[in-house]
Amino acid sequence: MGILSKVEDRPTPPSVYNWRVYACGAVAGSAAIMIGYDSAFIGTTLALPSFKDEFHFEKLGTKAVNLLNANIVSCYQAGAFFGALFAYIAAFFLGRSKGLAIFSAIFVVGAAMMLGANGDRGLGLIYGGRVLAGIGVGGCSNLAPIYISEISPPAIRGRLVCMFELGWQIGGLVGFWINVGLLPQS
């Protein structure tokens, strides 16, 4: 028995194990890339000198800066909590794939809001974008593994669900290393 061999409890036609199953699993698993990326980049972003300069953190005291940082991170977690709750409703009434599409769109809107934030506009866009991104991430982290496990044949179900975790870790790596590249060179 090899590492990629299939173990079946009942015979399944070979036509079931086609590229479509793997492609659907990979696409649904790619939802985890946004989860890993958004979770990873914020810590190093808050520490970047360019971020602190843009939002005038130097004018604030240490306690105020710590409070702002905690609020920026917490908004995302609060959104993820409610996104995970709303995911059940979306999955029940709309289905898993439509729910994934909706929560991914919510994430994109949140990311666009954060992209539009600058020192002149203040942190409001970042707070709102973090909440929406959290809702999208919470919904996708709930729906993607369920969707993948439902579409995959039993013999390769674990392999396909691992695509979700792989996407999460790839997103985390990208999120951390992009900010390392943005650090000022000394």
Per-range role (PLM):
Residues 1-186:
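Transmembrane-helix signature of 12-pass secondary carriers
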